[in-house]
Amino acid sequence: MADDSGTENEGSGCTGWFMVEAIVQHPTGTQISDDEDEEVEDSGYDMVDFIDDSNITHNSLEAQALFNRQEADTHYATVQDLKRKYLGSPYVSPINTIAEAVESEISPRLDAIKLTRQPKKVKRRLFQTRELTDSGYGYSEVEAGTGTQVEKHGVPENGGDGQEKDTGRDIEGEEHTEAEAPTNSVREHAGTAGILELLKCKDLRAALLGKFKECFGLSFIDLIRPFKSDKTTCADWVVAGFGIHHSISEAFQKLIEPLSLYAHIQWLTNAWGMVLLVLVRFKVNKSRSTVARTLATLLNIPDNQMLIEPPKIQSGVAALYWFRTGISNASTVIGEAPEWITRQTVIEHGLADSQFKLTEMVQWAYDNDICEESEIAFEYAQRGDFDSNARAFLNSNMQAKYVKDCATMCRHYKHAEMRKMSIKQWIKHRGSKIEGTGNWKPIVQFLRHQNIEFIPFLSKFKLWLHGTPKKNCIAIVGPPDTGKSYFCMSLISFLGGTVISHVNSSSHFWLQPLVDAKVALLDDATQPCWIYMDTYMRNLLDGNPMSIDRKHKALTLIKCPPLLVTSNIDITKEEKYKYLHTRVTTFTFPNPFPFDRNGNAVYELSNANWKCFFERLSSSLDIQDSEDEEDGSNSQAFRCVPGTVVRTL
């Protein structure tokens, strides 16, 4: 068996394990440092204070908090210095006073220190403000439910935002006025930044209206009448512009002058910049969209920063405002004042508009030969700009009654005038209303085209024109498209006659238009129409007096005016109409009406040509003027307006 390790000669001497300790002070060749004390032994007492194992007391905890707070104050002051260096002075809300704005621009910290605190929670306000957080990032958005609200952003009562909670900074009792942090570039003016942020609110129009009232002291609605459509044109416009650069205000007068006939310009300066109010009358009518594009170019602002509406021309208060501000040094006026301002501010114009005279309206309708109610109302309303009686008519609450009365009276005068005239005077009266001389030859050429001898036609036409009994009716018959209706309609148009139709024969009043006519036309008589005339209208065709039933009026006795009839039926070839053969003079148009290659009528039967026809053949038709009338009519023009007597002193 092998020997145990570490044993030799078991049984003699020491046996088993033993510990050998060797101390090596310096290896061979090691140099010993001169400043090292080789003889001093390290006892370990110099490492006692490396770790503080003593109990933590309350005073040491306060020291740590004080140190942290001092560090936070130092960091906060450094950040504020950077903000003031790169962001500029903060801008306060427009709802504050000017003194507060100036104070805030000097020092935002000074503005935050106040003896009287503003309430932290405010009610809904018209304007919206942007605020800058302590960290300098982003915007603090304002939420609004149905309208635009303003919140006074300050430090919450729980000690501040997240950053301030970490630093432990106590800012209770201090409010910070915050400003917008531009992302692209630094704003040139704090006021420009404020107006741009204001225009981002939800109800832009309400914000602009509120700012206008704050600047000018009156509502913008009091000066304008709103147009719903942007395409409606008008010559006069009221424009309010916001956020305009001050350099444009100096040149705006020269820029607007070439485009306008009148301009009333007012400039005001507020914390946002320049605000413009202008009343302008352009040389041509413009729509709102056109005005917006024009002024946006001149003022160098977007069109959503402008309020554009036409002025309230019927308001005396609005006219007085423009008049009073126009004569003050607060406005610049170019051109002559509009007539609607002068009319409502000059005393004599105001007195002239106070009373409406129906006689002047009737005289105007009579002179212009207007008897339709709708036409009277429309045309007379357009005279309101220069006619005092028309302005009084527009201001009246009885316009419908006045229009109806005017049309009724005008028809009465016209009817009485017509019945008073002979056919000779009537033809001359109708010819005096037609301009131009015309040519009578196309009428004669058309009759020859229809194989009608002109001399026999002229003799029968003269008897018809004067309403000779048994010769009071002329019938133009023939195939379709031969020009029968064209020939008769042109003649009736010149003579100012009326047209009746058998389609209304079921009514007792279908012949009522004959009462107020000088001549008449029955177009396209069919078989039932001829039968009706043969049965009931023989006396009327004779040209003798007969009674006519009128609606809502008693029967009236009249002599039938000269009557023209067009038809495709030749009654001279019908034996059953033998009683009409002697009462109706018949002419046949057998040939189609000719047209040129462009579709125009070869024979023009215009009013001017008929005028020349009657003037040329007046002696043959027995309608020539007498010797007393050759020098002109000595009758006085009709006048329904009472005259005035000029009394001499």
Curated annotation (Swiss-Prot):
Residues annotated as binding ATP? 478-485
- The SF3 helicase domain extends over 452-602
| Cellular component annotations (GO), alphabetically ordered | host cell nucleus
Q: Which UniProt keywords apply?
A: ATP-binding, DNA replication, DNA-binding, Early protein, Helicase, Host nucleus, Hydrolase, Isomerase, Isopeptide bond, Nucleotide-binding, Phosphoprotein, Ubl conjugation
Stretch list, region DNA-binding region: 187-353
Keyword hit for Glycoprotein: no
User: Record's Pfam families?
Assistant: PPV_E1_C, PPV_E1_DBD, PPV_E1_N
Residue numbers carrying Phosphoserine: 89, 93, 107
Motif extent (Nuclear localization signal): 83-85
Q: Which domain of life is it from?
A: Viruses
Q: Which GO terms describe its biological process?
A: DNA replication
- Span list, region Disordered: 138-169
Annotated GO molecular function terms are: ATP binding; ATP hydrolysis activity; DNA binding; DNA helicase activity
Q: How is it modified after translation?
A: Phosphorylated. Sumoylated.
Q: Where does it reside?
A: Host nucleus
Identify the residue span(s) of motif Nuclear export signal.
Answer: 106-115
N-terminal signal peptide: none
Which pairs of positions does the record mark as disulfide bonds? none
Q: Where is this cross-link: Glycyl lysine isopeptide (Lys-Gly) (interchain with G-Cter in SUMO)?
A: 559
| Catalytic reaction(s) noted | Couples ATP hydrolysis with the unwinding of duplex DNA by translocating in the 3'-5' direction; ATP + H2O = ADP + phosphate + H(+)
Q: What class of enzyme is it?
A: isomerase
Q: What is its EC number?
A: 5.6.2.4
Q: What does this protein do?
A: ATP-dependent DNA 3'-5' helicase required for initiation of viral DNA replication. It forms a complex with the viral E2 protein. The E1-E2 complex binds to the replication origin which contains binding sites for both proteins. During the initial step, a dimer of E1 interacts with a dimer of protein E2 leading to a complex that binds the viral origin of replication with high specificity. Then, a second dimer of E1 displaces the E2 dimer in an ATP-dependent manner to form the E1 tetramer.
Q: How does it assemble?
A: Can form hexamers. Interacts with E2 protein; this interaction increases E1 DNA binding specificity. Interacts with host DNA polymerase subunit POLA2. Interacts with host single stranded DNA-binding protein RPA1. Interacts with host TOP1; this interaction stimulates the enzymatic activity of TOP1.
| Protein name according to UniProt | Replication protein E1
Native source species: Human papillomavirus type 6a
At the highest ranks, the source species' classification is:
Viruses, Monodnaviria, Shotokuvirae, Cossaviricota, Papovaviricetes
